[in-house]
Amino acid sequence: MKKKTTLSEEDQALFRQLMAGTRKIKQDTIVHRPQRKKVSEVPVKRLIQEQVDASHYFSDEFQPLLNADGPVKYVRPGVDHFEAKKLRRGDYSPELFLDLHGLTQLQAKQELGALIAACRREHVFCACVMHGHGKHILKQQTPLWLAQHPHVMAFHQAPKEYGGDAALLVLIEVEEWLPPELP
């Protein structure tokens, strides 16, 4: 490993002289994620109750109106449509992943409820739900269930690196979280 070379006093003075009158460039391209709060240990009964409460919103009878053309996407009324575009482009990277492969519809609903509850509890605003291709049952039902939940702000078909058309990126409403503002 190379040793660091130190500049002589003369070189340092020359550098300061050349840099006089310059100003620091404002960083405007990378949006930093807000710091997540540390989560304390949660009792098992509370976790089960959160899961039941969150899955209460999912109904098989209600069919929300989703766009049938192109990739699967949804934006809750009152949420900026640009959020779905950011999901599509991969500007948000998911912090929690849920794999629904091999689950029944009832199990999948419970796991979705648990994921949303965990996201809100741990202040995670982007998650990835992998429903897979399979017999297209979960692939069709998952967006319908997510669109019914009041804490789901938006979702979009995941980019290739997160599963492509076999997965969804979901934006979850967290109380303190606001989308980062670009300057």
UniProtKB/Swiss-Prot annotation:
Top enzyme category: hydrolase
An example Gene Ontology biological process: rescue of stalled ribosome
Top-level lineage group: Bacteria
Residue span, Smr domain: 98-173
GO molecular function, one term: rRNA binding
Protein's UniProt keywords contain Protein biosynthesis: no
Annotated signal peptide: none
Record's keyword terms, sorted: Endonuclease, Hydrolase, Nuclease, RNA-binding, rRNA-binding
Pfam families recorded: Smr
EC assignment: 3.1.-.-
UniProt function note: Acts as a ribosome collision sensor. Detects stalled/collided disomes (pairs of ribosomes where the leading ribosome is stalled and a second ribosome has collided with it) and endonucleolytically cleaves mRNA at the 5' boundary of the stalled ribosome. Stalled/collided disomes form a new interface (primarily via the 30S subunits) that binds SmrB. Cleaved mRNA becomes available for tmRNA ligation, leading to ribosomal subunit dissociation and rescue of stalled ribosomes.
HAMAP family in UniProt: SmrB
Family of this protein: Belongs to the SmrB family.
This protein's name: Ribosome rescue factor SmrB
